[in-house]
Amino acid sequence: MNTNPNSIRCSDCAGSSRRDFLKTTLAATAATTLGSIPIIGRAAEEAARPKSETLVASLYKSFNEAQRKALCFPWDHLLRTEVDNNWHVTEQHIGSFLNADQQQMVREIFLGLHSPDYAEKVFKQVEDDSGKAGFGDSSIALFGEPGTGQFEFVLTGRHCTRRCDGDSTEGAAFGGPIFYGHAAQGFNERPDHPGNVDWYQAVRANEVFQMLDGKQRAIALRNKGRMEQGSETVKLSGKTQGLPGIPLTELSQDQRGHVRKVMADLLAPFRKEDADEALKYIEAAGFEHLHMAFYKDQDIGSDGVWDVWQLEGPNMVWYFRGDPHVHVWVNVKAQA
């Protein structure tokens, strides 16, 4: 089901060092965290849009018999919980299988799953990474039935797994595991990842590493990141100790505060209700139980600005793999 594009070396490989990039970019990225977004204004903007769940129900009702047979599945179907970096949940692509009105509904559903500040940027990323077909290369599936309390929409493609469930999936932020990523200027990105819509998150994470002393860095810096193996990539351990990297209990108050800024950056692209739910689950399991790890074996440019890193706790994995381009794997659940 997966497809892997051929490696393409970027032709424009000159530029300033990433340390300079970090310095010049931090001021800009500071404005993109959740803490800098006025909550009232953000909520009002999101409230003005049709709710994604409402649009999913309308989409379901619009299907003809052939579409329903191809795209609709029972709630407990195994495909509902799958996640991967480059896959299609169904064989039918929306650009050729849905009519124009239905395609527009899917677009609005996708946009509505993201915050107003990021929705169009993330949509453009999916367009750019999907080749000539653009967003139309995506595929969708619907599980369960509207009005039953068990109903979920899943959209997939290259660098995309998103879900819309109206909290049908109890105790799962974002409706279950999700994936996002970007190959901005070719398969093999330059060390500073120019044009990558997600790289600002790694910029913030590297700030945390710069705040660590030598002893802390020795704990936080590991060799190689986890293997990418579909849903296994985001399997939760349930553990509060012994996870890769440095536990937040070993950080100072200022350092932990900066990790909270990283978390805000990670949640910033998503609609407020999903971001709030994810943070609620993380806090309930104990923010102090998170571990932060950086991986030195996948350092593009060998300059000590870490392209691969993660936050992991007993009930969450947020794995950022920035080599050779950005893949981000996410799974956040309520505490068991």
What are the functions of these language-model segments?
Residues 45-65, 69-336:
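A cross-kingdom marker for long, charged
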Residues 38-43:
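Signal peptide processing junction and immediate N-terminal pro/mature segment
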Residues 15, 28-32, 44-45, 182-185:
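Intrinsic disorder/low-complexity segments
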Residues 28, 35-36, 120, 273:
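Short, polar/charged, Gly/Pro-enriched helix-capping and turn/loop motifs at alpha-helix termini
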